[in-house]
Design a protein with these regions (language model features):
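Bacterial N-terminal signal peptides
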Residues: 13-23
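Short helix-capping/linker turns of helical repeat alpha-solenoids
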Residues: 30, 42-47, 60-63, 76-78, ...
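Terminal, low-structured helical/coil segments at or just beyond the last alpha-helical repeat
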Residues: 32, 141-176
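Bacterial N-terminal signal peptides that target proteins for export
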Residues: 2-14
Length: 176
């Protein structure tokens, strides 16, 4: 009898824990979405201090989109001192997670030696190629620009370097 009661209690406890976790996950997702929306609105209004205060904690928690947008603030010097090295660090973290915009941005930086010395066309080609594959229809304008930039970078690579970059693209896996 005690075993049956314990099994029932354990089952109820497991269901309750699952419900609590689902509610927490849903609440967190809504909170994240709301923070991203508020930060984007603040950024558009040029309230960079508010955008920074919302994106920075999310970036520190590993949110790829927040890392990319914060990187853009450092790239432009909007609300923070202009710092291409910090922008590159943030873009690379987000790019490694598979975020297409960050992949393009870090590829651009590698291709032009901005914030990432030295210039590295092989890395530029790899990251821009990954971005092209990751851009959605919503980002068609960015994708078209990335295709042009990849062609520019490719023109500076030898056949061997180009082959190595293609192998790197095929072998690439996002970090979690």
């Amino acid at each position: 009898m005690k075993k049956d009661l314990w099994k029932s209690f354990s089952s109820v406890l497991a269901v309750a824990a699952t419900v609590v976790m689902a509610v927490f996950a849903h609440s967190y997702a809504q909170s994240l979405e709301e923070s991203m929306r508020r930060a984007a609105g603040a950024y558009e209004r040029k309230d960079f201090a508010l955008a920074l205060s919302l994106w920075k904690p999310l970036a520190e928690q590993g949110n790829a989109e927040a890392r990319t947008l914060l990187g853009a603030m450092y790239w432009q010097g909007e609300g923070v001192p202009r710092d291409h090295k910090e922008a590159a660090r943030l873009y690379l973290l987000a790019a490694e997670q598979g975020y297409a915009r960050a992949q393009y941005d870090i590829g651009f930086m590698y291709g032009f030696g901005e914030g990432i010395p030295p210039q590295d066309d092989g890395q530029a080609y790899k990251w821009i190629g990954l971005a092209i594959a990751g851009f959605t229809v919503k980002n068609e304008d960015r994708r078209e620009q990335a295709i042009k930039d990849r062609a520019t970078v490719a023109s500076r690579l030898s056949k061997e370097q180009l082959a190595e970059a293609e192998i790197a693209i095929k072998a690439w896996k996002p970090k979690q």
